[in-house]
Amino acid sequence: MENLTVNAVVDNLDEVTGFVLKRLDNYGCSKKTLMQIRLAVEEIFVTIASYAFDPSVGPAEVRCEVMQDPLRVVIQFLDGGRPFDPLAKEDADTSADALFSRDGGLGILLVKETMDGVSYSYENGKNILTIEKKLKDTEEACL
């Protein structure tokens, strides 16, 4: 698995998304699949940058690997910030009135609904959030 370590600050978002998307260059992914992966990466990294170490700054590691059978990308986000399982919270309410509330949770709901797998663990003092997206097994994924 290739990895990138950066300070968990929003200013590093472009570097993180570029790192992930570059690994998909040779797989002919559809625009839809790339956008779903990009949005998931952005949501997760911005959440880490905003809350993991607040008010200080710490490192975040992003690991990315394209796997075979089925063809898919596995992306892991690791940080040593305070323990936080974004999957433990009940899914956000998507009714019209709730969309204007500040309860949060819409971002992780988007990740859960667009990725094929999402898991969280806390090991050796690190939050580890793993997302997985199939690259060829769906009609619109990759050509």
What does each model-found stretch correspond to?
Residues 99-115:
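Glycine-rich phosphate-binding loop
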Residues 58-66:
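A conserved short beta-strand within the histidine kinase catalytic ATPase domain
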Residues 20-42, 100-102:
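Conserved short strand/loop->alpha-helix "switch" segment adjacent to the catalytic nucleotide/phosphoryl-transfer site
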Residues 43-47, 113:
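Conserved polar catalytic motif of the HATPase_c/GHKL fold
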Residues 52-57:
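A short, flexible helix-to-loop-to-beta junction within the catalytic ATP-binding CA
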Residues 2-31:
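Helix-loop-beta hinge of the Bergerat
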Residues 71-103:
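Glycine-rich/acidic phosphate-handling loop/turn and adjacent ATP-lid/helix
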Residues 1-4, 8-10, 112-143:
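Flexible, glycine-/charge-rich segments associated with ATP-binding catalytic modules
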